[in-house]
Amino acid sequence: MITISDAAQAHFVKLLADQPEGTHIRVFVISPGTPSAECGVSYCPPDAVEADDIELEFNGFHAMVDEKSAPFLEDASIDFVTDQLGSQLTLKAPNAKMRKVDADAPLKERIEYVIQSEINPQLASHGGNIMLVDIDEAGIAILQFGGGCNGCSMVDVTLKDGIEKQLLDMFPGELTGVRDVTEHQHGEHSYQ
């Protein structure tokens, strides 16, 4: 469920040494499965352990995960990185905003998952996003751009060289192309 690097495990052991005996860590997601999902790590004293918590054993401590957060922490990783600027704990949870779908889920659900977990985070750097409207009988994903992508002069390049290429590579034989149905209007909201 959660991978914690050796460096992060050593860091947690050091932090927990200053806490009351029996204190572990809690890894959680606030508003899981939503665009505003936030992940966190906190101390978990013995009296804060819930009956339905999932207990993960690590080197010198345990990590508690509440039942509601668990599916959104699949494939999560925690690392402790040190560089010339200092050190920091990093938590990456690719499924926090949307639960990972099974490989045999309907094509629409699998494409929606890729859009939310991989494509939209890239477009967000320009204030943009895309939404899957439908998949037609010919296997073409109908997409609609929003935010900074609406009216952007580079939208065709983003669509064909970025999004379409990525989706066709991920869904060969199932998807035949993508089509933009956005009524683009260049304005102050547009990226370029």
Curated annotation (Swiss-Prot):
Q: How is the cofactor bound?
A: Binds 1 [4Fe-4S] cluster per subunit. The cluster is presumably bound at the interface of two monomers.
| Superkingdom, natural source | Bacteria
This protein's cofactor list reads: [4Fe-4S] cluster
- Annotated positions binding [4Fe-4S] cluster: 149, 152
- GO molecular-function annotation terms? 4 iron, 4 sulfur cluster binding; iron ion binding
Give all cystine bridges in this chain. none
Question: One biological process GO term for this chain?
Answer: iron-sulfur cluster assembly
State its role. Answer: Involved in iron-sulfur cluster biogenesis. Binds a 4Fe-4S cluster, can transfer this cluster to apoproteins, and thereby intervenes in the maturation of Fe/S proteins. Could also act as a scaffold/chaperone for damaged Fe/S proteins.
Q: NCBIfam families recorded for this chain? A: PRK11190.1 (NF008392), YhgI_GntY (TIGR03341)
Name the chain's protein.
Answer: Fe/S biogenesis protein NfuA
* Organism field: Shewanella loihica (strain ATCC BAA-1088 / PV-4)
Which lineage ranks, top first, belong to the organism behind this chain? Bacteria, Pseudomonadati, Pseudomonadota, Gammaproteobacteria, Alteromonadales
Its gene name is: nfuA
